[in-house]
Amino acid sequence: MKRGHDYSSSDSELDENIEVEKESADENGNLSSMSPSTSSQILARKRRRGIIEKRRRDRINNSLSELRRLVPSAFEKQGSAKLEKAEILQMTVDHLKMLHTAGGKGYFDAHALAMDYRSLGFRECLAEVARYLSIIEGMETADPLRVRLVSHLNNYASQREAASTAHTSIGHIPWGGTFAHHPHLSHPLLLAQTAHTNSTSSSTEAHHHNRLRGSPHAESSSLRVAPNGNIASVLPVVASSKLSPPLLSSMASLSAFPFSFGSFHLLSPNSLSPTTPTPSGKPYRPWGTEIGAF
C-alpha cells in the first residue's frame, strides 16, 4: 500500500532533516574516504551549529531572567521557589493583560512602577522581621510584642499602598512621610535639636562647641566638634566598658565621614550607660517599650 504524503512538516524542516541525514551518512560511511579539507569543513560546520545553538539558549535564558525581574508577581515569588519557564511566561501574559485592562496605566508611570517595587521590598523586609523575631529572639507567634510590631508594619504597608494609588490626585508622598511626624516614635537615646539657619550658623556652632567643652563628660562620652562646626573624622575617646559593642561599631562608622552638625540628632551624654541584662536572662531590647505606642 502506498503511504500518503505527510504535509505536517514545513519545507525548511524537511530540508534541514535531509541535510542532517546527508551529513550523518557522510560522517559514518565515507569519513575515511574524505579528503582532509572536506572533513575539516564538516567539523567546522558542526562546531558553528553548536555555538549558534548555545547563543540561542543564552538569549532565551537572559530574556526569561529579565521577565522574572520585571514582572512583579514573578519577582515576588523568585525568592521562595524556582520558577519554571512556562510559569514566567504565564505571569508575563497575565501582567500584560492586567495592564491592557487598566487602560495602559503603568507603561510610562515611573513613580507607580517604583512604588510597586518598594511595596514588594517592604513586604519582604516585614517577612524577615517576623522570621528574626521567631528564630533569633525566640518569640512565639502569639507574643504580644511580636503581634503589635507585625500588625503595625502591616498597617503601614497598607497605608503606603493606598497612598500610592491616589498619587495622581494628591501628588508624591515621600516614603518616610508617615514616620516623620509620628508623636510616639521619639527614642530616649535621641535628643531634639532645633534647626539651624544660615543667618545664625556661627553663633549656634559656638554654642554647641562651648556646651560640649563645658560638659564633664565631653572628652569621654560625646563627639568632638571641629572649628568649622562639623563633626570631624575623629573617633571619640570612650571607655569600652561604658559602651556596648554595637554602639561602639556605629560610633566608629560615624567617625569615618564628616557630617554637618545640624543635620542629625546627637546622643545624650548620660544615655551612654551600660546596658543591664534583665533578671529573666533575655537580651535587653530598648525598642520593646516603644512598640506599645504603635
Curated annotation (Swiss-Prot):
| Motif YRPW motif, residue numbers | 284-287
Q: Which PROSITE patterns match?
A: BHLH, ORANGE
Give start and end of each Orange domain: 117-153
Q: Where is this region: Disordered?
A: 1-48, 195-225
Tissue localization of expression is: Expression in late gastrula and early neurula embryos is restricted to dorsal endodermal cells and the medial neural plate and in dorsal endodermal cells. Expression fills exactly the gap in between the two rows of motor neurons in the ventral neural tube. At later stages, expressed in the floor plate, in hypochord cells and in the somitogenic and anterior presomitic mesoderm. By tailbud stage, also highly expressed in the dorsal hindbrain, telencephalon and eye vesicles, olfactory placodes, branchial arches, tail fin and somites.
User: Which SMART domains has this protein been placed in?
Assistant: HLH (SM00353), ORANGE (SM00511)
Please provide the record's keywords in A-Z order: Developmental protein, DNA-binding, Notch signaling pathway, Nucleus, Repressor, Transcription, Transcription regulation
Pinpoint the bHLH domain residues: 44-99
Reading the lineage from the top rank, the first entry is Eukaryota
Q: Polar residues bias located where?
A: 27-42, 195-204
* Keyword Transcription listed: yes
Instruction: Spell out the subcellular localization from the entry.
Output: Nucleus
Q: Give the matching SUPFAM superfamilies.
A: HLH, helix-loop-helix DNA-binding domain, Orange domain-like
Gene3D superfamilies registered for this protein in UniProt: 6.10.250.980, Helix-loop-helix DNA-binding domain
Q: What does it do?
A: Downstream effector of Notch signaling. Transcriptional repressor which binds preferentially to the canonical E box sequence 5'-CACGTG-3'. Acts as a suppressor of neurogenesis by antagonizing proneural gene function. Functions during floorplate development. Plays a role in pronephros formation in the inhibition of distal tubule and duct cell fates and the promotion of glomus and proximal tubule formation.
What PANTHER family would the database entry show? BASIC HELIX-LOOP-HELIX TRANSCRIPTION FACTOR, HES-RELATED
Domain description: The Orange domain, downstream sequence and the bHLH are required for efficient heterodimerization with hes/hairy proteins, and for transcriptional repressor activity.
Name of the featured protein? Hairy/enhancer-of-split related with YRPW motif protein 1
Write the gene name. hey1
